[in-house]
């Protein structure tokens, strides 16, 4: 009886969340493509969350492999540290490392605001002042080129006062066939109203990888399902007759973790003295009193077993995640990084998910993401070495003829290799 009651309440809560989800398209009125921008080509930037660099071959994503054979495939794409969803999606569209654009984790604390950001809190997700840099859709809109987003980190926020012309707030309710039809509808709008940059997002592979692990049949099914959806998407877009180029990326990979030997909070940490946002593969401690930082750090160094401890000031430079990099002051005072495949876990009555990401991508190859590109802008049958995801930004700006003056961390080296007319 108790189980039935619990199930009822779980279902009720789920239905309530679905009912509250905002599934309406947002349209910013009064915008038009300039005559110059109406002549530009089109880019659809697709993210398949958690699509590890080897999944396409491992699980037989036949459509994706076929398109990349006629286009470009990277050995892998290296995520920025930490290899987590929000920091890396935003790095892809800003060309900046997380420490430079401000989304330093999925959950973090901002000292100057005395407030915390959470990927699960619509209030913070939709507040533009949390986001640094100039995402691609903002750059395009500033130059009178219309954009659309069917989900991307930051696309629901008024970054620099700008939204995409067409966008949706994130939900997983709208059926994929409906989403594809909407993309086609966007591309069939009159030229003055038609978006030239569209972002599109798939969460399913990441969900399966977390819940079942990267080697599970459910993960294979998710990869193949997304591959079939991509075929539907490209077929629908082809009917428009427009010169559309595709860039398909992922934010990170996925790895198996040790669910039986997890790490608890080290005894040296008095949790009453620190603000500690959620974390498993990276734990950031923000001291309420700066005088507590050094003594706790020294105690942690003595307890250092199956994890590494750093101060913000002595993080390895290749992370681009230290005090000198921390433009917005959002990196923790003390950072605890578990040794792969260990994770921090603070829920004793249940095990963590078997699949995870967030580890050092230069030490754990499973963190590497995917990069595929095809369409009229790209060279054919080209395989390139691994590269950092901050280099995607210049690829898109070159295809669309967008100019940027702000300093970014990416370069045009990859774009020059893969574009027909860089």
Where do the PLM segments sit?
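A long, amphipathic alpha-helix that forms part
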Residues: 176-188, 205-246, 295-298, 396
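His/Asp/Glu-rich, glycine-adjacent segments
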Residues: 96-213
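Bacterial Sec-dependent N-terminal signal peptides
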Residues: 1-25
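Coil residues (strongly favoring Ser/Thr
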Residues: 22-23, 228, 271
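Metal-dependent active-site segment of extracytoplasmic phospho-/sulfohydrolases and closely related
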Residues: 45, 63, 225-265
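Active-site neighborhoods of enzymes that stabilize oxyanions during catalysis
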Residues: 278-383, 387-398
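Active-site nucleophile/metal-coordination loop of metallo-enzymes that catalyze phosphate/sulfate
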Residues: 21-39, 53-142, 158
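Loop/turn elements at helix/coil->beta-strand transitions in domains of secreted/extracellular proteins
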Residues: 39-43, 70-74, 142-148, 192-198, ...
């Amino acid at each position: 009886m108790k189980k039935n009651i619990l199930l009822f309440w779980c279902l009720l809560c789920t239905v309530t969340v679905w009912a509250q989800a905002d599934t309406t398209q947002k349209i910013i009125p009064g915008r038009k493509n300039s005559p110059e921008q109406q002549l530009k080509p089109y880019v659809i930037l697709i993210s398949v969350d958690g699509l590890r660099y080897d999944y396409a071959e491992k699980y037989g994503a036949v459509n994706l492999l076929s398109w990349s054979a006629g286009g470009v495939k990277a050995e892998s794409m290296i995520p920025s540290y930490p290899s987590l969803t929000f920091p890396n999606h935003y790095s892809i569209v800003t060309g900046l490392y997380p420490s430079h654009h401000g989304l330093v984790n999925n959950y973090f604390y901002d000292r100057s605001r005395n407030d915390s950001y959470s990927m699960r809190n619509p209030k913070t997700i939709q507040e533009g002042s949390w986001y640094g840099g100039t995402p691609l859709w903002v750059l395009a809109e500033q130059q009178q080129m219309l954009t659309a987003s069917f989900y991307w980190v930051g696309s629901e926020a008024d970054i620099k006062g700008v939204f995409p012309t067409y966008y949706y707030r994130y939900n997983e309710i709208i059926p994929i066939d409906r989403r594809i039809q909407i993309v086609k509808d966007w591309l069939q709008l009159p030229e003055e109203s038609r978006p030239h940059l569209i972002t599109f997002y798939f969460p399913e592979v990441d969900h399966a990888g977390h819940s079942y692990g990267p080697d599970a049949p459910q993960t294979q099914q998710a990869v193949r399902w997304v591959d079939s959806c991509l075929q539907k998407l490209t077929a629908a877009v082809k009917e428009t007759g427009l010169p559309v180029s595709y860039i398909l990326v992922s934010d990170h990979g996925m790895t198996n973790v040790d669910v039986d030997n997890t790490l608890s909070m080290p005894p040296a940490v008095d949790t009453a003295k620190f603000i500690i946002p959620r974390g498993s593969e990276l734990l950031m401690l923000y001291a309420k009193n700066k005088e507590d930082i050094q003594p706790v750090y020294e105690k942690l160094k003595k307890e250092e077993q199956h994890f590494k401890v750093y101060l913000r000031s002595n993080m390895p430079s290749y992370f681009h995640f230290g005090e000198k990099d921390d433009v917005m002051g959002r990196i923790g005072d003390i950072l605890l990084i578990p040794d792969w495949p260990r994770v921090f876990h603070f829920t004793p009555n249940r095990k963590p998910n078997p699949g995870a990401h967030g580890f050092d991508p230069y030490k754990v190859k499973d963190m590497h993401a995917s990069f595929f590109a095809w369409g009229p802008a790209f060279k054919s049958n080209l395989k390139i070495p691994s590269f950092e995801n901050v280099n995607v930004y210049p690829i898109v700006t070159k295809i669309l003829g967008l100019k940027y003056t702000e300093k970014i961390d990416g370069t045009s080296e990859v774009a020059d290799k893969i574009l027909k007319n860089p």
